[in-house]
């Protein structure tokens, strides 16, 4: 199986075009779709992470009316795969979109190769 490490905790299984958790190998959906939709999603009040630094009207802590910390966890092992700071109600972002067809073409043509689960140039 051809596997590519995309992020610290996210792999691309190229043969079956699936996202996989790097820790527990949980299937996170089609690599042609947003892996985040298969994740456990938790929204946190930013004040839980960024404690107010001073007792005043402006505390240097993010305002929860303006921002939420959105965490994406693997549903298999609960490893945190991604974190985003988004306005409340903002849709889930689609931050990784790989052109799988072009990637396969370049691998087949020998322009790229997979070494130790990393994508590398042959030139």
Where are these regions (language model features)?
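Short, intrinsically disordered terminal segments enriched in charged and Pro/Gly residues
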Residues: 1-12, 88-123
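Flanking scaffold residues of small Cys/His-coordinated metal-binding clusters
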Residues: 15-16, 66-69
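Short cysteine-rich clusters marking metal-coordination/redox-active sites
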Residues: 21-25, 74-77
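Short recognition patches in nucleic-acid-associated and regulatory proteins
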Residues: 1-8, 22, 26-63, 86-88
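Short, well-ordered loop/turn elements at secondary-structure boundaries
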Residues: 14-15, 23
């Amino acid at each position: 199986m051809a596997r590519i490490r995309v992020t610290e905790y996210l792999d691309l299984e190229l043969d079956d075009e699936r996202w996989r958790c790097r820790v527990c190998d949980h299937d996170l959906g089609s690599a042609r779709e947003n892996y985040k939709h298969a994740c456990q999603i938790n929204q946190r009040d930013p004040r839980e992470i960024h404690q107010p630094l001073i007792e005043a009207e402006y505390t240097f802590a993010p305002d929860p009316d303006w921002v939420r910390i959105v965490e994406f966890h693997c549903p298999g092992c609960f490893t945190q795969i991604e974190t985003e700071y988004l306005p409340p109600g903002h849709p889930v972002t689609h931050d990784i979109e790989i052109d799988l067809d072009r990637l396969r073409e370049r691998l087949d043509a020998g322009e790229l190769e997979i070494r130790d689960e990393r994508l590398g140039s042959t030139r």
